[in-house]
Amino acid sequence: SAQLNQPAIQTFIEQFRKVADSYSGDRFLMGELHGDDPTLASETFTAPGRLHATYNFSLLEWGGLDVDGLKSAISAAIGRFNGSGRLSFAFSNHDVPRSATRQLAPLGLSEDDQEAMQLLLLKLEASLIGSTCVYQGEELALSDVQDIPISQMQDPWGIEFAPLFLGRDTCRTPMVWEKAKNNWSGFSEASKTWLPIAEKHIQRSGIDEAARSGSVYDQFSKFLAWRAQQPAMVHANSM
């Protein structure tokens, strides 16, 4: 886009990188770049001395019912970046329904099979080159909250177009850390949260899922620990 092509933007990114590099410890700068040619934008902004990686939208745009579409989305993303850590992948973020709702629910699976598919998507994402971006709740196999009253919505799109379009609040409800309800399930000690806590999420709280053997969280954590010990997974120049 015209904005991204401004030389001043690239100069600013280089200055920003110098500031980040002046600190000790691990640092990672990722840019959310979209435009007419996001791959070209990624190449430009991850040149030496700029960002470490850019956010990739290809898997966010996959509908979930088409295996060939998934293969095409991955191939298009890695085609010009094969072997580079400058890529990142995400199935969900704060602007689209979670993968459990957008990509898996249309399959009509049982709860157990949907959990298995959620774990499979997470493992697939973590097996691709580059960085993995897991959106809050994916590791718990959470689906979106689609029964938020209009009076409690915050997203202008949802307020304007519900019930035809529920907006983005459905994937933005508070993270549920524990089953206790007296502190918004561990999320906040405030008298009110920005969006309501989802009752169905309380049964999959972070603490409980982390302790439950065989949960998506448990299995994905073990997979990531295994992945970190596989040189081919960490350093290979292809999927």
Explain the meaning of each model-derived region.
Residues S1-P7:
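Aromatic- and acidic-residue-enriched carbohydrate-binding clefts of CAZyme catalytic domains
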Residues P7, T11-R27, G35, T44-N56, ...:
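Loop/helix patches that line or flank the sugar-binding groove of alpha-linked glycan CAZymes
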Residues D66:
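Conserved NTP/Mg2+-binding pocket subregion across the NTase superfamily
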Residues T39-L40:
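Catalytic core of soluble alpha/beta enzymes
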